[in-house]
């Protein structure tokens, strides 16, 4: 039995869901309840957090251009994703996807997390590079689990204050370049 249905035209699927690929939703999961989290993410979209995924992530930039800010060895690096590019991100590489172009679309494939495996979400100080805040959770639903975590960070000056230099992270308006 084909529990995920028959083959379909992926481009047509994207066109039919394009209204969900922009703010405030920004993404749409292709299949539910599979071993893979297959998501199409649209732009524009900017993030100030860095995701610490315990597993690999696959990116295929379908339309437009995007980039990943990476946090490696205490410094920010940038990986460009041009239309047509694919990229496999190793586990535990802190990354912050940036999709500045309206109408852009990226296929992102991740594995479902085994029970007890946690994802981390981190924010860094724009002034000195120190990690300001980290939250860990067993990720079950990107749509339901993440907004409360992000809101808790953005709404708390205490959580946004750098422990090293005292500068307050600007929250949603933080650095994304």
From Swiss-Prot:
Q: Which reaction does it catalyse?
A: 3-hydroxyanthranilate + O2 = (2Z,4Z)-2-amino-3-carboxymuconate 6-semialdehyde
- Asked if the keyword Oxidoreductase belongs to this entry, the reply reads yes
Q: Provide a Gene Ontology MF annotation, just one.
A: ferrous iron binding
Q: SUPFAM superfamilies, from UniProt? A: RmlC-like cupins
Binding note for cofactor: Binds 2 Fe(2+) ions per subunit.
What are its cofactors? Fe(2+)
What does the sequence similarity comment in the record state about its family?
Answer: Belongs to the 3-HAO family.
Q: What does this protein do?
A: Catalyzes the oxidative ring opening of 3-hydroxyanthranilate to 2-amino-3-carboxymuconate semialdehyde, which spontaneously cyclizes to quinolinate.
Spell out the subunit comment. Homodimer.
Protein's recorded name = 3-hydroxyanthranilate 3,4-dioxygenase
